[in-house]
Regions:
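Hydrophobic beta-strand residues in large extracellular and virion-surface proteins
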Residues: 4-6, 21, 33, 48-51
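Short linear sequence elements within intrinsically disordered, low-complexity coil regions
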Residues: 9, 18-20, 38-39, 45
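Short, flexible N-terminal segments of the mature chain
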Residues: 13-36
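A short beta-strand micro-motif
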Residues: 2-12
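Short, mixed-charge low-complexity intrinsically disordered segments
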Residues: 36-55
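A generic structural signal for short beta-strands and their flanking turns/coil linkers
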Residues: 2-4, 29, 39, 47
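Secondary-structure boundary/capping motif
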Residues: 1-3, 26, 55
Length: 55
């Protein structure tokens, strides 16, 4: 499990948090977060201000 710090912004909200994921992939304008074989979050790349792997 890897820990990531993510900062997301859109017209409606701003969000910063640390999340744990086994894998992160970028595909077709989306950043996809995996926990094993399951996707638990998909975010449009245009909303991601920063994404940093902490470990």
């Amino acid at each position: 499990m890897n820990t990531y710090r993510i900062h997301i912004r859109s017209d409606e909200f701003q969000y910063t948090n640390e999340i744990e994921a086994t894998n992160v992939e970028e595909e077709d304008g989306w950043t996809v977060f995996w926990n094993g074989k399951d996707v638990f979050m998909r975010i449009r790349d245009e909303h991601i201000v920063s994404l940093e792997r902490l470990n």
